[in-house]
Amino acid sequence: GLDLVFFDGEDYGKHTDTDYYLLGSRHFAANLEGYRPVAAVLLDMVGGKGTTARREGTSDERSRAFMDYVFARAQALDLRYFESTPGLPMLDDHVPLLQAGIQAIDLFGYDFAEWHTLRDDGSAVDRAKVEETGILLRDLVYNFKFEK
């Protein structure tokens, strides 16, 4: 089946204090007894105006085969928002999942100038980029054929 799980890495807003960071995903990853997801996709600031979704560094290093699969699907679907170029590594909710042995990637919208500013609102969203993200996710749900 398909599970939707919602986390916010900045649970308490203290990204400099790792005791209060990634709480939801750390709890989820620590309580997987009897349950093992095949893979996980984290959506992180996707769809912002001026952003591109590139190959997030931690995902590319630790889940390269799954990252290859997802970006190949995006290319096959002619989704231009997803650029198969290297991106910086991120400490985010995919990391506890990776540490738990789950193939996890962070689809990250790089170069989002409005992040954590008063302009970080609905007007900063690019509808076409959100739509491309939805097309990719729908494809992954209906046509998923990834094996570790």
Q: What do these predicted regions represent?
A:
Residues G1-A65:
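Acidic/histidine-rich catalytic neighborhood of metal-dependent amide-processing enzymes
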Residues A39, V46-K148:
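Active-site-adjacent substrate-binding region
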